[in-house]
């Protein structure tokens, strides 16, 4: 149970995607701190206090800002940092594996920040957008690579899998979370997605993966679109 002030005025965001959400909710003056990876919106990145990286938070700097609400994420932030902050400040953590989890997170943050109407509008617009794209994948299979050497993919029970299956693709990886390509042998794959993050796949990687999957279409993809 997190005891949040009725209307928090000093919010710190520990996750880039949730920083964008706070901006979309119109919380410009309320957000006082973001991470060095919170590059969107650019206007905030230029002027907001940066409190370290998602997994290397500057706890002393955070303490000096005296936040009345800290918003983090179970996967992005470390257990040690969060436990330390929870002893001193209200900390709310998201835990997102599916698109539905993301919608629930938007609603919860909207309620906490007195922006419930704005949050509900964002959810409604997102649902409409996904409904429009629901047949984009046409049942084709995919592997979404997040790392190279060793090669890791996004499997089941990940937000990436939820996003792509929602628009009609099928994951060729049946394993959960982020298995190594060496841990399973995929059947025929229609599409290979090489993400821009966390590993920065570039054009020079395309030929390598085309040789591994000669019948697949290889795509360089903006990781922010599938994992933020």
Label every PLM stretch briefly:
Residues 1-228:
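N-terminal ligand-binding lobe of clamshell/alpha-beta domains
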């Amino acid at each position: 149970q997190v005891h949040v002030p009725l209307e928090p005025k000093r919010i710190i965001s520990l996750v880039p995607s949730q920083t964008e959400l706070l901006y979309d909710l119109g919380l410009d003056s309320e957000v006082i701190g973001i991470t060095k990876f919170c590059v969107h919106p650019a206007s905030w990145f230029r002027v907001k206090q940066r409190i370290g990286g998602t997994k290397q938070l500057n706890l002393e700097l955070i303490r000096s800002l005296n936040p009345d609400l800290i918003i983090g994420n179970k996967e992005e932030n470390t257990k040690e940092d969060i436990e330390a902050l929870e002893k001193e400040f209200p900390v709310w953590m998201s835990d997102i594996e599916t698109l539905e989890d993301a919608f629930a997170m938007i609603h919860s943050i909207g309620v906490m920040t007195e922006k419930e109407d704005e949050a509900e509008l964002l959810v409604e617009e997102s649902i409409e957008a996904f409904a429009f794209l629901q047949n984009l994948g046409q049942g084709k299979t995919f592997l979404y690579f997040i790392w190279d050497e060793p090669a890791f993919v996004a499997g089941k029970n990940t937000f990436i899998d939820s996003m792509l299956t929602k628009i009609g693709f099928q994951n060729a990886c049946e394993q959960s979370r982020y298995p190594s390509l060496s841990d399973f042998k995929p059947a025929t794959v229609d599409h290979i997605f090489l993400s821009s993050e966390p590993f920065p796949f570039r054009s020079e990687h395309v030929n390598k993966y085309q040789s591994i999957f000669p019948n697949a279409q290889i795509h360089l993809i903006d990781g922010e679109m599938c994992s933020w």
